């Protein structure tokens, strides 16, 4: 009789249990989790060859609801439940609503979502609807929605605001930096990521800084935050009244985490830059076709920023770079299908298929 085979690896417990000693979680709190975190860090071979750097992709679209938001939401909803709050509320361009709705459903509490009129990808809205969220469309943009959410939760303290202004969101999201250092053995030279409401760059810098402070990592990365050119307040230094970009997840004109994002950029000797929609879409197609990673357009801003920064010399060849790709491409299928070539039927004949493929 053959010996029993050992498990290939231990099951991932979710990020709260994995990093409990580094999170502000009470011992008696009931954890609200969908086993988020533990996402892969994939070596991007062809983008590495293109840039002359060693590039890794932190693929956050493989979190339970398809985006990095789940990292913060597990901690924020766990804390809200511990405080006995009756509902959670968020303003959202899409991913936050999907995540908040899922974790509220898991916790057995109400979720309400304020969305800007006509400014949300349908895949994300479908998730929130399926998880039972109460969807409220606001005649305004994301910034208007967030201001309304702030006022509402201030007036009704039984409702928790779970946007990234909630510090527990930042605590959960910082764990992605822990995972990167755990995988690489130290921090990368450069960490590139998209910037919208700016909570994520704040969280990554917090995570890297804590690991460095405690001697887990012997260095800190330079933070490279890329905004869409039509929604680039951190680049221009002024709020954008009517932000516009195909990258809906970062279509934000006045980031809630503005000050902490600037601190992360300055303390890390990093930079903010703007990428046009054309540059973002080029990176979106590049990562899908050369690395097999399908991301939503906003996610590709990190790669667009890297390409621009290699071109202008800010990122030196030979650097180790991590690009966070924040959301799954299935969040926004409409963008992927735009410009799709006309499909013409072929006969039920192997030679016809071979000819269509251009093979011999």
Curated annotation (Swiss-Prot):
Which cofactors, if any, are listed as required?
Answer: pyridoxal 5'-phosphate
Record carries keyword Ubl conjugation: yes
PROSITE patterns named in the record: DEHYDRATASE_SER_THR
Write out the residues that bind pyridoxal 5'-phosphate. Answer: 95, 196-200, 326
> In the record, which positions carry N6-(pyridoxal phosphate)lysine?
69
EC annotation?
A: 4.2.3.1
Q: In which pathway does it act?
A: Amino-acid biosynthesis; L-threonine biosynthesis; L-threonine from L-aspartate: step 5/5
Q: Name one Pfam family in it.
A: PALP
Q: What keywords are annotated for this sequence in UniProt?
A: Amino-acid biosynthesis, Isopeptide bond, Lyase, Pyridoxal phosphate, Threonine biosynthesis, Ubl conjugation
What CDD domains does this protein's entry cite? Answer: Thr-synth_1
Q: Where is this cross-link: Isoglutamyl lysine isopeptide (Lys-Gln) (interchain with Q-Cter in protein Pup)?
A: 151
Xref: InterPro entries = Ser/Thr_Dehydratase, Ser/Thr_deHydtase_PyrdxlP-BS, Thr_synthase-like, Thr_Synthase_bac/arc, TrpB-like_PALP, TrpB-like_PALP_sf
Question: What does the record list as GO biological process?
Answer: isoleucine biosynthetic process; L-serine catabolic process; threonine biosynthetic process; threonine catabolic process
Q: Which GO terms describe its molecular function?
A: L-serine ammonia-lyase activity; pyridoxal phosphate binding; threonine deaminase activity; threonine synthase activity
**Catalytic EC class:** lyase
Reactions catalysed, as given in the entry: O-phospho-L-homoserine + H2O = L-threonine + phosphate
Its domain of life?
Bacteria
Iron-sulfur found in the keyword field: no
Its function, per the record, reads: Catalyzes the gamma-elimination of phosphate from L-phosphohomoserine and the beta-addition of water to produce L-threonine.
Q: How does it assemble?
A: Homodimer.
Q: Record's family?
A: Belongs to the threonine synthase family.
User: Which NCBIfam families does the UniProt entry name for this protein?
Assistant: thrC
Q: What is this protein called?
A: Threonine synthase
Lineage of the source organism? Bacteria, Bacillati, Actinomycetota, Actinomycetes, Mycobacteriales
